[in-house]
Every structure is written in C-alpha cells, then in structure tokens.
Curated annotation (Swiss-Prot):
SUPFAM superfamilies named among the record's database cross-references: PurM C-terminal domain-like, PurM N-terminal domain-like
Positions bound to Mg(2+) 1: 96, 536
Homology family: Belongs to the FGAMS family.
Annotated source species: Caulobacter vibrioides (strain ATCC 19089 / CIP 103742 / CB 15) (Caulobacter crescentus)
Residue numbers binding substrate: 97-100, 119, 243, 315-317, 538
Predominant cellular place of this UniProt entry's protein: cytoplasm
Quaternary state and interactors: Monomer. Part of the FGAM synthase complex composed of 1 PurL, 1 PurQ and 2 PurS subunits.
Catalytic activity: N(2)-formyl-N(1)-(5-phospho-beta-D-ribosyl)glycinamide + L-glutamine + ATP + H2O = 2-formamido-N(1)-(5-O-phospho-beta-D-ribosyl)acetamidine + L-glutamate + ADP + phosphate + H(+)
Protein known as: Phosphoribosylformylglycinamidine synthase subunit PurL
NCBIfam families xref list: FGAM_synth_II (TIGR01736), PRK01213.1 (NF002290)
Function: Part of the phosphoribosylformylglycinamidine synthase complex involved in the purines biosynthetic pathway. Catalyzes the ATP-dependent conversion of formylglycinamide ribonucleotide (FGAR) and glutamine to yield formylglycinamidine ribonucleotide (FGAM) and glutamate. The FGAM synthase complex is composed of three subunits. PurQ produces an ammonia molecule by converting glutamine to glutamate. PurL transfers the ammonia molecule to FGAR to form FGAM in an ATP-dependent manner.
Positions contributing to ATP binding: 55, 94, 498, 535
Top-rank lineage group of the source organism: Bacteria
Amino acid sequence: MSTSSTPSAKPMAEMAAEFGLKPAEYDVVLKRLGREPNLVELGVFSVMWSEHCSYKSSKNQLKKFPIDGPRVICGPGENAGVIDIGDGDAIIFKMESHNHPSYIEPYQGAATGVGGIMRDVFTMGARPIALLNALRFGDPSHPKTKRLVDGVVAGIAGYGNCVGVPTVAGETNFHKGYNGNILVNAMCVGLAKADSIFYSAAPGPGLAVVYFGSKTGRDGIHGATMSSAEFSEDSEEKRPTVQVGDPFAEKLLIEATLELMATGAVAAIQDMGAAGLTSSSVEMAGKGGVGIELNMDMVPQRETGMSAYEMMLSESQERMLAVLKPGREQDGHAIFEKWGLDAAVIGYTTDTGRLVLKHHGETVCDVPLAPLFDDAPLYDRPWVQPALQPRLDPAAVPAPTNWNEAVLKIIGCPDMASKRWLWEQYDRHVMADTLEDSATGCDAGIVRIHGTGKAIAVTSDCTPRYVQADPYEGGKQAVAEAWRNLTAAGALPIAITDNLNFGSPEKPETMGQIVRATDGMAEACRALDFPVVSGNVSLYNETNGVAIPPTPTVGGVGLLEDYDLRTGFGNVAEGDTLVLVGETRGELGASIYLREILGREDGAPPPVDLALERKTGDFVRGLISSGLVAGVHDLSDGGLLVAAADVALASKIGVTLNATSQTHAHAYLLGEDQARYLIATPDPDAVLEAAKEAGVHANVAGVAGGEAFASDGLFSVSLDALRAAHEAWLPGYMSAPKA
C-alpha cells in the first residue's frame, strides 16, 4: 500500500498535532491500526475525530435531551429531524453553525452555511420551504463589525434568494463578546411526504456509490478541523479552508435529488458537508454496517493534479453521495445529465467493514470503519459550577432620570432597533406561501402548507446575556421563549432543533456552562413536551483565549391546523385594550434596561417557572382559538415597554400604558419576567374572566389609540419619534463612513 498521497517531510506525529489530534488521540490511532497511518489515513482520522464531526466533548451532554414524541418520525442521528404534521405530510428541519468560516470570509462563510443546511434537509427527501438565521456580531464600534455584518447578510441573501427559498425569521444581536468570533447559525425547514423519508445508512454490500453535483476542488480542505479550533490573530490566513458556494448549482442539485428519489432508485443518500467525501462515505457505510471502497480516479475534479488526501478532505460545495439500488445507475445518469450535473460511480459498498481508497492503481487508504464512525474518543470533561449573579432588588435599581430619553434609547439600541436594513435584503415571499415574516409583526415566521389549510410557525431564540449570568436558567429560557413565540403566533409547539455555541470545552469554566445550559434546556424540553429532533454543536468559539458569551440557540417549529387562526401584533385597532397575561415581579437582572440605560451587565436573569410557562401558554392558545384576541405578543427583551412599543409600531397606532399605580414603575415596565404575553382585545372583561377561571394572572396594562406612545405621568413620545428611533440605527451605522 502507498504510504503517502501528498508528500510530507514531517513526522506523522507532528502532522497529527497540526491536524488537531492530541498526542493521546494519535496513540489511539496507532493502536487501532497497529501501524503508523499514511497522510491520507491521518487526514481521515483527524477530520472524523474532530469536535465538529465526532461531538466528543458534548455527546454525553446531548444524551440528556428528550428526543421522542408522538409526532417524531426521526430524531437526532440523521441529517435532520423529521416530525409528522398529519395528512401524510412531514416537516424536516435542522439548525447548524458556520461561525468560524463566516468570521474569516463573511460572504462565502454565510452563503455556504445556508447551502449546507439546505442540503441536510433535502437529502432526506424534503423540498426546502423556509430559512431562518441567528446572527451574533461584535460591538458596533469594533473595526471589523461593519464589514462582517455587510458580508454575512449579503452572503445569506445571495444564496437563499438565488436558490429560491424564503428567509422568514431570525434574530440579530451585537455584543463585544463576539468581537473576535461572530456566530452565524442557519436553519432550514422542508416539506416531505411522511412515507418517503430518505436515510443515510447503506443497506448492504455490492451497491454502487454515486457522486453527483459540482466538481471537487481544493476549497475547504480541513474546514472541519478549523471549525474545531479556537482563533488567534492569524486566523484570517485560514481563508483557503473556507468553502465557495454556487447557489445556482444548489438549485439544480435540489431538483435532481428530489427527481432521483421519486424514481425509487435511492437506497441511501448523504450530502457532502463537513469533512466532505470522508464524512459522507464513512457515515453511510458505518450506519449500514458495511465497508466501502472508492476509486479516487473517478471523482469529478475541478483542479488538476489533486491528491487522494485533497479529494477526501475537500469541502467543495453542492455535492452529494448516493448508494443506488442494484441496476439503477442508468436512472441516475439520465437525471444528472438532464440537470447538467457532474456524476460518476466512484465505488461500491463491501462486506469488509473497511474504508479502502484507491488512486492511480495504488491503495492509498485501508482502515477499519468502526474507529472512524462510532469509536471516536469520548470525553467526560471536568467542569466547575458557573459563578452566579445575585438577584437584583427592583428597589435598589435606579429608575430613569429622563423617561422619554430612556424609551427612545432602548427602542433604538443595536439589539432592539429595527433590522429592516438586514431582512429587506432577503426574499421573504418567494414560493408564495409566506403568511408572516420579519416585516409583519408576528413572533414567528409562518409558512402555509401549500394546498391545505395548515401552516407551520418557525422561530429562533436565545438570550446570551441570561446564559452568561446563569447558564441553567438561560438554557431553560431559550427553550421557553421559542415555545412562547410559537404560542403567541397561534401555533402548537411541536419540536426543536438547537445550535450550541460555546468556547473551549477543555476549560472547566466553559464546560460548566455547557453542562448547566444543557441541563436547563433538557428540563424545559421535558416540561413543555418540546423534543429535540436535530441540532449542532459549535465549540472552541474563542479568540486569543477569550470565549464568546455562551449561546445555545433554539430553533422551534409549531403547527397551525388552521392558518386563519394565526395571530400577530400588527392589526391592533383603536380602542383595543391591552391585557398583560402572566405574573410580574419586576426582574431587572441581566436586562436590556440595565445594560443600555445604566451601563451595567450584572444581576441574575429572570427565573423560568416551567409549570407556569406551560399553564400560561396553554391559556393563551385557548384564548386565540376562542376568537377573543385582536393581537398577541410575547414579552422578552425590554419587558412590557418594548412589547407595547412593538405593538404601536407594527399596528401604526398609539399605546398608553398604566404604570403609575405600580410601586416600582420602572421594574413593572422594563422587567423581563418570563411566561408573559401582551394580549390586545376588544373585550377585556371576557379575557380577564377567562384568566380568572383558568387561574392565570392577568391585568389591564393599557389601551391602544391616539398618536403617542405613553405612560401617564412618566413618558410620552410621538409615534413618529418612536419610529424614527427604532428605524435609524442600523441603516445609519451601515452607511456611515469608516472612522
């Protein structure tokens, strides 16, 4: 067997370290093989054992999540999660990160993040119908932030718009904690038939392995390894590890894949994502309990002279690997030719249980699959309990000295300001099934199931400052807010995907954040019957030893049996009464008010009472079904004040809040207590009576009408001033000349 595919003068142990393998891990490789690996084999082991592919530091924590439910068809372990929405239909969805690539090369990093998550979904037989994104950028004053925002947003828009899938929801935050490591989490939702789901396990030996899609180039080599390491000042030199996307090729790939599936020729299928051809071939064979032999000479190549090492580790985009049923190769050939895709039979499944690669007539890799697929190192890393912040007494937190100025500053700060500049670049209505999106005043994006009266609601949520202050409560809150947003839109929450973004798990403090945040998430999922069906873990998000704020992002999916019963907060009318549903203690710890007005980032986050969360949410869904409400908005960042301002802006109507009777008006208006909703109704007596009967706290909070946003005796700003403050920041920031 050839000992090398790409010549190297360095000892293998030194190369292993450069590839991200620890000395102890390399020793395990030697033990598994009984010899020293060659460069191709070392590359294969390094990417499959990377954090990005193996989940070696997080797998033990992920076992805590509930993954089953009456609607779950397929949970974690496949390319995406699958849930049954009735009438023979299924929703397939997943969220995934492209953090490191997007920091190094923002346009391509973000664009290929969108492309990659779509492939995870259509690989399982679904047509993508919605995209979401959760973006975290550094402080606006940081010299790189504006360029990163511009590139990431353009990349998301450029890819999603060209493929023709609407971007319907998302969230965007700014904080200095992301200065050296931004987060780009992309989510895709697809629609499939429940009896036509495709999986990745190769069903037996002797079957043709077909490569189709774009040619393989040298872009993205060791991308998975790069995404499993922390950054330094030299990280921008890693641009060659960032993949380059072609959305038009992706569109062709979607159509060809779905057409191929419809012929019945597909036995197993897998997209080529992180670790490229290595990961796809190893996973298909490993899950099926078979071996696989590939002839690298047959791989379609974009560049001349590529080695087997380069072809196996390339992360060139828009590529698929399929195992076809016996004798069906010609069916595939005709479809690939129709759609203008490169394609070739590059190998066969075997009964050896080994990964064998041949190139130019030589065997350049011959290793057992088991250590690659299901025997990667698994770590139960040491951790320490995160230091927690004390609860802030509302009486000890100063009220604004100038309420009008405070209102405008809060509503216009980077996190609260309108993101219109951003989402107007996304095509939100392509496919013509979007009912609610970022522009309409709704707590979730809503997309109808074409040809039915049903719709799905989708949302993305996390409050990193809560997780920083208390990972356990912050983890609970991320799940609870997703559940609450879907409820406020009129949907029944069904399941979640997640994207766990943290620093280095080798640091006990960071590992403590991971452990406690996932504890909280798991508890919330169980209490709310909100199973985790897919997800992604992104670790080593730190630069020069400084970690990002812990950011476990949750993507939630809910079902509306009748989309005419959807709710938002953009149609509140003159004279509607605003009823606050849920209990208010005035929790100001880790709040927007504390940070933006008082310049503080301290205090315990609002605790999440999951029993109360469920009771209140179930009550609100019942109210929506009864037809008593004109609008619903959940309370989160900025509390009642921001929720009411959102209503005023979306409905283009004034709002007057009643707060003068409160002991601590600033805590009542700006506290961020959980399990609360703002209900607009023409019949407040009926709502209050229903709440009393259900044992749910509710009180009249204000009234809609006029042309001002006000609270008697505290503040009054015109709608025009409120809108100007809300809309001004982001376009002003992006258009300002460099300092």
